[in-house]
């Protein structure tokens, strides 16, 4: 049986980095090694891509995975047909990836950026496409799309950071009015 090459992306430059590491540990421990060649690629908080050189996934949540002596720098090329690039000394090894499983949370993971890279590279991936990811990440845009589609949802009010900084009292009044009107519907 021919195994499918699967790249599991985890970590990321996001406040959700630690959550992603815990999620990736679970996903990687439950993948069938008889069916898949697994390429676990972690993205550090600084944005470095590292092919994790071990199958001891318990080291992911603790951060110990970063110290594995078999780790190698890696990247997914946006050029179609290049796949996963693994850097070993002066050499670059190409591994064709059949599918990517992004186990990334938050900004730069669920917002369409990784999905856009994978679309450029022509690599299929698990999860929503670029536009759906971007819309879902922006809560205001999600609410506007849901409103436009007639989806029932709780009343909401957009408050921008600058409004809170410059006009806090007016924001409080608007919020109080919104709550009162919601209670009387």
What is each model feature region?
Residues 2-10, 14-15, 21-22, 90, ...:
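Active-site nucleotide/adenylate-binding loops and adjacent lid/helix of ATP-dependent enzymes
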Residues 2-45, 53:
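N-terminal phosphate-binding or glycine-rich loops at protein starts, especially the Walker A/P-loop
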Residues 12, 93-137, 152-158:
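A short, GP-enriched loop/loop-strand-helix hinge that lies immediately N-terminal to
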Residues 23-27, 114, 142:
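Hydrophobic residues within alpha-helices
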Residues 32, 119, 147:
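Anion (oxyanion) recognition and catalysis
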Residues 43, 49-119:
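N-terminal glycine-rich "phosphate-gripper" loop used for MgATP/nucleotide binding
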Residues 48-49, 164:
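Acidic pyrophosphate-coordinating catalytic loop
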């Amino acid at each position: 049986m021919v195994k499918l090459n699967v790249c599991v992306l985890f970590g990321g430059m996001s406040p959700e980095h630690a959550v992603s590491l815990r999620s990736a540990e679970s996903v990687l421990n439950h993948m069938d090694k008889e069916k898949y060649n697994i390429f676990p690629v972690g993205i550090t908080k600084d944005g470095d891509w590292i092919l994790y050189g071990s199958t001891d996934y318990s080291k992911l949540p603790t951060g110990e995975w970063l110290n594995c002596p078999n780790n190698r720098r890696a990247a997914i090329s946006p050029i179609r047909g290049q796949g996963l690039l693994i850097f070993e000394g002066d050499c670059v090894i190409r591994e064709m990836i059949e599918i990517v499983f992004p186990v990334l949370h938050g900004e730069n993971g669920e917002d369409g950026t990784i999905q856009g890279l994978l679309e450029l590279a022509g690599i299929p991936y698990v999860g929503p496409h670029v536009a759906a990811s971007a819309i879902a990440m922006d809560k205001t845009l999600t609410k506007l799309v849901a409103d436009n589609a007639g989806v029932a949802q709780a009343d909401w009010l957009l408050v921008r950071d600058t409004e809170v900084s410059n006009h806090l009292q007016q924001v409080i009044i608007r919020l109080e009015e919104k709550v009162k009107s919601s209670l009387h519907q």
